[in-house]
Amino acid sequence: MSNKIKAAIIGPGNIGMDLMFKLMRSKYIDVDTVVGIIPESEGLALARKHGKKTSAEGIKAILGNKDIKIVFDATSAKAHLKHAPLLEQDGKIAIDLTPAAVGPYCVPAVTMEEQLNCKNVNMVTCAGQATTPIVYAINKIADVKYAEIVATISSRSAGPGTRQNIDEFTETTAKALEKIGGADKGKAIIILNPAEPPIMMRNTIYTRVANPDAPGIIEAIEEMVGKIKKYVPGYRLKVPPIIDGDKITTIIEVEGEGAYLPKYAGNLDIITAAAVAFADEVAKKLLAEEQAKEVRAHG
């Protein structure tokens, strides 16, 4: 029995590379292969330098490889729509870091347990990971009628993939505020801030609620921040929640861990950290199943 589950990453951009470095610390996952479509890509060269198999043939290079059980897709929403059915036919678990949203929205602090058997999960967006759990926490106590989030990220942290996905980004984030957050209506706005030095990712979450129970709301928000901090240490409340009648304003800042990407790229850090937190649990489950099979075979 292997001690780790083999995985592949499609898309060697900012997110794909940050994922690779985070997964290199995982106790349960071994990144076997990194694939892209540009032979001279810096990401593929970096993956090779770290001993990973690489290919510029895209998804073709991993289809049919039975050893690879989990595939992280860090390409674009349009590309994932093509990849999803191919990965499913090949029996691979897809963790989608694009806003394609083929599978259910996955926000580990809220949905982890119920999704461990899913064959395709969507990591929403960086803003979705940062804001949906807060809306969920407020909704449990106060019934959120409307949620609007403004995610401000450094222009420098937005690579070509993020920029191509802006429309899908706002749409997917708004839907997650409703589906996972529980808001009756959700809206998302993203702002790319060109300031130098680059700013930290900041998320302002406005909610209107039916039952404004201030102490209950503050407690629920603080508890949720604690849960997220376990897998995103740089996640924090910028100021305490501001409660004005039925309006609640929560401001969250996300500082990246600064291992591969700079600390201001908290927007990328939160989605890769969430993907790894979820993937580790899936891999743990697969390893336990492998072990049980071996015990039965030798029993």
UniProtKB/Swiss-Prot annotation:
Cross-referenced SUPFAM superfamilies: Glyceraldehyde-3-phosphate dehydrogenase-like, C-terminal domain, NAD(P)-binding Rossmann-fold domains
Active site, UniProt feature: C126 (acyl-thioester intermediate)
Keyword Oxidoreductase carried by entry: yes
Gene Ontology molecular function: acetaldehyde dehydrogenase (acetylating) activity; NAD binding
InterPro entries: Acetaldehyde_dehydrogenase, Acetylaldehyde_DH_C, NAD(P)-bd_dom_sf, Semialdehyde_DH_NAD-bd
Pfam families reported in the protein's UniProt record: AcetDehyd-dimer, Semialdhyde_dh
Keyword Ribonucleoprotein annotated: no
Enzyme Commission number(s) from the entry: 1.2.1.10
NCBIfam families assigned: ac_ald_DH_ac (TIGR03215), PRK08300.1 (NF006157)
Protein name per Swiss-Prot or TrEMBL: Acetaldehyde dehydrogenase
The species this protein was found in: Carboxydothermus hydrogenoformans (strain ATCC BAA-161 / DSM 6008 / Z-2901)
Organism lineage: Bacteria, Bacillati, Bacillota, Clostridia, Thermoanaerobacterales
